[in-house]
Amino acid sequence: MQQNTNVDPLEIAKFERMAETWWDLNGEFKPLHLLNPLRLNYIDQTAGGIFGKKVLDVGCGGGILSESMARIGAIVHGLDMGEEPLEVARLHALETGVSINYVKNTAEAHREEHREYYDVVTCMEMLEHVPDPQSVIQACCDMVKPGGFVFFSTINRNIKSFVETIIGAEYLLKMLPIGTHDHNKFIKPSELMALVDNTDLLCKDALGITYNPLTGIFKYTPKVDVNYMIATQKVD
């Protein structure tokens, strides 16, 4: 797929409409704010610390993960194709005094001048929103240095994930706007591993994340049956 075509305009428009609520801790992106500390800790611990390292956040949206990585000393570039979320991210970084370079571009196009440039690349909750996940994974691989880490997170495709993330989170609990997710675009761990195997990345770890609606708390779980993350490392 061409580097400038791996974009779904409907997905971009969906997140453009929600951009103004990105930093509302009780708004439509509340789940991401609750989830972010777990993601940040997993990335920082697995990569051996990101302080002083060059990090690319692919599909950064309004900058929740990007800002948290910058606050602990990473040199962060945020990449997204949504202009409204990027403007929100830039403004919030300015207001909070965090230095981040936000760029409107696809991973495939950004790769052209950033091959083996980053120590760490993150691609969280993004693969299920693009037409060609393999293309994004390859671009992430190409942009990380040998020995560097690439992190992916997405949602497993099964009955349980449909019930929890769409019926539960969107319709019953109203944690997310209806239509945020398309179950057909969810990616099974075996499928993601197969895509990773087509690159120079090696899967080092996989970890699930579960949500308790009674306590409102996310926590790690060894089960990857719904939300999950994988850590990969580029072969030297």
Swiss-Prot record:
Gene: ubiG
EC number, UniProt record: 2.1.1.222, 2.1.1.64
Pathway annotation from the record: Cofactor biosynthesis; ubiquinone biosynthesis
Catalyzed reactions: a 3-demethylubiquinol + S-adenosyl-L-methionine = a ubiquinol + S-adenosyl-L-homocysteine + H(+); a 3-(all-trans-polyprenyl)benzene-1,2-diol + S-adenosyl-L-methionine = a 2-methoxy-6-(all-trans-polyprenyl)phenol + S-adenosyl-L-homocysteine + H(+)
GO molecular function, one term: 2-polyprenyl-6-hydroxyphenol methylase activity
Protein name (record): Ubiquinone biosynthesis O-methyltransferase
Binding site for S-adenosyl-L-methionine: 39, 59, 80, 124
A Pfam match: Methyltransf_23
Top EC group: transferase
Organism: Shewanella sp. (strain ANA-3)
GO biological process, any: methylation
UniProt keyword list: Methyltransferase, S-adenosyl-L-methionine, Transferase, Ubiquinone biosynthesis
InterPro entries to which the protein is assigned, alphabetical: SAM-dependent_MTases_sf, UbiG_MeTrfase
General function of this protein: O-methyltransferase that catalyzes the 2 O-methylation steps in the ubiquinone biosynthetic pathway.
Family: Belongs to the methyltransferase superfamily. UbiG/COQ3 family.
Domain of life: Bacteria
